[in-house]
């Protein structure tokens, strides 16, 4: 049925009027060319696509039917790119076909990429526009091409809809589409807050882990259509101005510099998410921007993004002065801006006064470090340092010139047969190792009561006299010493106690092993508090017996110093010989021998013979310091009535006390009666025999 003539005239007038409102962008051969349309088609190889002639969708106010009724025809051309030769398209009607104002590809091939120009014309009018089609392949291992994605942004904690884009041509109006959604090309168990509506995916509350690539898949005929959208999550849109981090707002920051040096003023600020707006940060001097200053030596660096997270950024910009001059000194301000406001902070570039703060601080720091090192070395090696100094530069003690002995050794004498497994090492140390090391190796002159005590009065008075003649008092705290209360002698005698309390003598207390669980140890603690000058040295077992151990160094440090060569003790010398310890000849043994000889001089022959054998068998037992022998005269007439297990004091010839024998006759040639004419045994008082003879 033909349209009435008035209707055709009206349609043509309307179409002509609509063309007048469009501005020409190019004209060639009388045809208006609108170049390439803004809409670009991007599909994956194998997918169907419909390319519409853009002239009917934005360039002219008519559609394909009206244009065709007005006598205009639609032609399609293809070219490889802008300016290339355009050739008419021959439609085969199957894979590529022309349907009204569109071209259908079912499916697309890689060679279909290019520019498709649609032209509407008649004999007097022509208009043209080109449409871009890109056919690509999936990225390796993915279900999409990264150059063909759509992009969406969502704010944290807000809702967001992701649409399956450009699928209108594949939807049927009478049927709901069956769309599958993937994230990163994988099926996913979606949380309840994610809802699917027709061709959209709704996230009701966006989280940071929602960032990623979302792919929708739709089946169309025998083909599959996929669209991929990359979702970016940002922080909520800020409603605050930027925050200055340095320099601090409302506070003047002073930066010192020297003339001729370069200066660098750095401004840092935090910008909340403001959409696609770039952060605005800059420096000013007074009312001038830095680029407006006449000096080329002063310039701004580029804006640097230090940190970025969910669209929020920490940025910085530096103001550099290459060579500072007097005119460069002054106040500089850093400004930061966004759509919500502006902030600024100031820095005063100040000339530094000449001060040697760094040098002074470095010198003091070096001195302090040196002092710390010296103190540490002194704390760790105090004894070694003091011994070295004393051995090379020290002087002997003057206050001990009137003393005869370097130390008085107080110990508990225990027969080796009575040593047990637990205390054997302690007793051996006290009786053998300690005196042997002090005398033989270090050359000290010790007073050992069991060896050197010369009875002149009561036992306690003798001990007090000998302690008074010693520069040090060494108390060896072995378990037996504690059990037998060996220190009680220093509490009974007033003179001894006063010496300890007033500090007249320095006491060296050697503790062997752990003594706290031993009976009477509480009294030992009380004794420590009584002594004024006390040094406690721990002996930790056989490992302390080594010459280079801390124990011997500590003991040597506490002993008096004197320049003396170490001496070696030998066996007892002959009576006619004088050794290095001639003045220390054992008195207890000699005095016992003298007393015994005096008693036997007048004893009955049978008694004398019996005692002679017994005495010599005892005297030849091992002595722990020196061994002395004295041949007892075989004759005597004095009955033996006072010899017992207690101390026996006697009158001894002075030549015998000095360790000498008469030179005129040998002891074997001398008449026993003549040798002991002036000797007699003196009985002891009961109070003198009340002290145990094993404590010295």
Curated annotation (Swiss-Prot):
It holds the Pfam family TIR. InterPro entries: Ig-like_dom, Ig-like_dom_sf, Ig-like_fold, Ig_sub, Ig_sub2, IL-1_rcpt_fam, IL-1RAcP-like_ig, Immunoglobulin_dom. It is found in: Cell membrane; Cytoplasm; Cell projection, Axon; Cell projection, Dendrite. The active site is at 491. Residues 19-357 are extracellular. Its main location: membrane. Keywords: Cell membrane, Cell projection, Cytoplasm, Disulfide bond, Glycoprotein, Hydrolase, Immunoglobulin domain, Membrane, NAD, Receptor, Repeat, Signal, Transmembrane, Transmembrane helix. Glycans are attached at residues 63, 122, 138, 213, 264, 331. The chain crosses the membrane at residues 358-378. Residues 19-134, 143-232, 242-350 form the Ig-like domain. Homodimer. Interacts (calcium-independent) with NCS1/FREQ. Interacts (via the first immunoglobilin domain) with PTPRD (via the second immunoglobilin domain); this interaction is PTPRD-splicing-dependent and induces pre- and post-synaptic differentiation of neurons and is required for IL1RAPL1-mediated synapse formation. Belongs to the interleukin-1 receptor family. This is Interleukin-1 receptor accessory protein-like 1. It comes from Pongo pygmaeus. The gene is IL1RAPL1.
């Amino acid at each position: 049925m033909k349209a009435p003539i008035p209707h055709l005239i009206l349609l043509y007038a309307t179409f002509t009027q609509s063309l007048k409102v469009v501005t020409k962008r190019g004209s060639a051969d009388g045809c208006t060319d609108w170049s390439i349309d803004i809409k670009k088609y991007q599909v994956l190889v194998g997918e169907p696509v419909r390319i519409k002639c853009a002239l009917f969708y934005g360039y002219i106010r008519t559609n394909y039917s009206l244009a065709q009724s007005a006598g205009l025809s639609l032609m399609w051309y293809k070219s490889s790119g802008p300016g290339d030769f355009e050739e008419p398209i021959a439609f085969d009607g199957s894979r590529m076909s022309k349907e009204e104002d569109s071209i259908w590809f079912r499916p697309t091939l890689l060679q279909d990429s290019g520019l498709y120009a649609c032209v509407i014309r008649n004999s007097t009018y022509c208009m043209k526009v080109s449409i871009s089609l890109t056919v690509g392949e999936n990225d390796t291992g993915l279900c999409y091409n990264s150059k063909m994605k759509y992009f969406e942004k969502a704010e944290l904690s807000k809702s967001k809809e992701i649409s399956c884009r450009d699928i209108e041509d594949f939807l049927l109006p009478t049927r709901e589409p069956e769309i599958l959604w993937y994230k990163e090309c994988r099926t996913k168990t979606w949380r309840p807050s994610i809802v699917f509506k027709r061709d959209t995916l709704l996230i009701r509350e966006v989280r940071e882990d929602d960032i990623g690539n979302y792919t929708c898949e739709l089946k169309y005929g025998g083909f599959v259509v996929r669209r991929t959208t990359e979702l970016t999550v940002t922080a909520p849109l800020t409603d605050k101005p930027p925050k200055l981090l340095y320099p601090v707002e409302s506070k003047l920051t002073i930066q010192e510099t020297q003339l001729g040096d370069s200066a660098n003023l750095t401004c840092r600020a935090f910008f909340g998410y403001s959409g696609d707006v770039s952060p605005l940060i800059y420096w000013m001097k007074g009312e001038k921007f830095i680029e407006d200053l006449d000096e080329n030596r002063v310039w701004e660096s580029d804006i640097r993004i230090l940190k970025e997270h969910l669209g929020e950024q920490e940025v910085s910009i530096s103001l550099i002065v290459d060579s500072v001059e007097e005119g460069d000194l002054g106040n500089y301000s850093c400004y930061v801006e966004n759509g919500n406001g502006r902030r600024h902070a100031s820095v005063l570039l100040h000339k530094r006064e000449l001060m040697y703060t760094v040098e002074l601080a470095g010198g003091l720091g070096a001195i302090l470090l040196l002092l710390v090192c010296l103190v540490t070395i002194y704390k760790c090696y105090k004894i070694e340092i003091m011994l070295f100094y004393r051995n090379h530069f020290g002087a002997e003690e003057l206050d001990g010139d009137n003393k005869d002995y370097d130390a008085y050794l107080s110990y508990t004498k225990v027969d080796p047969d009575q040593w047990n497994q637990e205390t054997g090492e302690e007793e051996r140390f006290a009786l053998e190792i300690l005196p042997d090391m002090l005398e033989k190796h270090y050359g000290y002159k010790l007073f050992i009561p069991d060896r050197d005590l010369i009875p002149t009065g009561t036992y306690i008075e003798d001990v007090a006299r000998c302690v008074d003649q010693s520069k040090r008092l060494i108390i060896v705290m072995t378990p037996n010493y504690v059990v037998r209360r060996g220190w009680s002698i220093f509490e009974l005698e007033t003179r001894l106690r006063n010496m300890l309390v007033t500090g007249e003598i320095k006491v060296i207390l050697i503790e062997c092993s752990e003594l706290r669980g031993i009976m009477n140890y509480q009294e030992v603690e009380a004794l420590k508090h009584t002594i004024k000058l006390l040094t406690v040295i721990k002996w930790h077992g056989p490992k302390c017996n080594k010459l280079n151990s801390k124990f011997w160094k500590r003991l040597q440090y506490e002993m008096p110093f004197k320049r003396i060569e170490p001496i070696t003790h030998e066996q007892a010398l002959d009576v006619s010989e004088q050794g290095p310890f001639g003045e220390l000849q054992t008195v207890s043994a000699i005095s016992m021998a003298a007393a015994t000889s005096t008693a036997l001089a007048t004893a009955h022959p049978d008694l004398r013979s019996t005692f002679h054998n017994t005495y010599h068998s005892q005297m030849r037992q091992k002595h722990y310091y020196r061994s002395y022998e004295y041949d007892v005269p075989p004759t005597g007439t004095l009955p033996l009535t006072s010899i017992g297990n207690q101390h026996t004091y006697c009158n001894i010839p002075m030549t015998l006390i000095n360790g000498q024998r008469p030179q005129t006759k040998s002891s074997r040639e001398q008449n026993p009666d003549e040798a002991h004419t002036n000797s007699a045994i003196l009985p002891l008082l009961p109070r003198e025999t009340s002290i145990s003879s094993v404590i010295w």
